[in-house]
């Protein structure tokens, strides 16, 4: 089995003016595709090539391969981006259980956003920022490069089931925002798919 590029559930310009069409197209068809190509190449003729990406990521610490670090980066890139595309949608509203849980953990929605933005802005270099469910407690964490919380603490230095995630690699925003990372981070709130996030809270 080879991993394939998932189709986006919207057009490349659907998130304008916050996430621009050119960035979305390059991000999806070039960067994400490259992670998939590399993952398939690394796993070719191994017993791991038939595993769903979620299972592969969850046992990464147990895998013995010469190119394990490259697998970590590229398989992580695949699962992170697959999650990211589903996490974006214009016009959704934060309501119900997720809103209650965020307020319980962080005080207010504005305080939650401020903390998320601070973690994203102060993360050095490339990586991701996540809202995760850690055994029933919502936490904001960051991971380096293409690490995922699903890889577990031994690899990603954190853990939890992702509820929302933001790509803070420069390729995710530089065409539109250049070095204005905070503007990109703040624009994210306009395209968070809160419906998907609420569904993830229930898992």
Curated annotation (Swiss-Prot):
EC number: 1.15.1.1
Catalytic activity: 2 superoxide + 2 H(+) = H2O2 + O2
Entry keywords, A to Z: Manganese, Metal-binding, Oxidoreductase
InterPro entries: Mn/Fe_SOD, Mn/Fe_SOD_BS, Mn/Fe_SOD_C, Mn/Fe_SOD_N, Mn/Fe_SOD_N_sf, SOD_C_sf
The keyword Transferase belongs to this UniProt entry's keyword annotation: no
Ligand binding (Mn(2+)): 27, 81, 167, 171
GO cellular-component term (any): cytoplasm
Cofactor names: Mn(2+)
Top-level taxon: Bacteria
The protein's role, per its UniProt record: Destroys superoxide anion radicals which are normally produced within the cells and which are toxic to biological systems.
Quaternary structure (record): Homodimer.
Annotated family: Belongs to the iron/manganese superoxide dismutase family.
UniProt-recorded name of the protein: Superoxide dismutase [Mn]
Taxonomy of the source species: Bacteria, Pseudomonadati, Pseudomonadota, Gammaproteobacteria, Enterobacterales
Gene name of this polypeptide: sodA
């Amino acid at each position: 089995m080879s991993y394939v590029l998932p189709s986006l559930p919207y057009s490349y310009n659907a998130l304008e003016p916050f996430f621009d069409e050119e960035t979305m197209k390059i991000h999806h068809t070039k960067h994400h595709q490259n992670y998939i190509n590399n993952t398939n190449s690394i796993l070719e003729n191994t017993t791991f090539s038939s595993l769903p990406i979620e299972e592969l990521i969850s046992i990464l610490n147990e895998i013995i391969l010469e190119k394990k670090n490259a697998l970590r980066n590229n398989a992580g890139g695949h699962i992170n981006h697959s999650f990211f595309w589903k996490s974006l949608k214009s016009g959704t509203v934060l309501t119900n259980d997720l809103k209650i849980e965020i307020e319980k953990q962080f005080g207010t929605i504005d305080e939650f956003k401020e903390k998320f933005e601070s973690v994203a802005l102060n993360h050095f270099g490339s990586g991701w920022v996540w809202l995760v469910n850690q055994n029933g407690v919502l936490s904001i964490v960051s991971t380096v490069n293409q690490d995922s919380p699903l890889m577990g603490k031994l690899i990603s230095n954190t853990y939890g089931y992702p509820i929302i995630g933001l790509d803070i690699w420069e390729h995710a925003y530089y065409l539109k925002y250049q070095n204005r990372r905070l503007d990109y981070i703040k624009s994210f709130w306009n395209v968070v798919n809160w419906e998907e996030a609420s569904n993830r809270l229930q898992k």
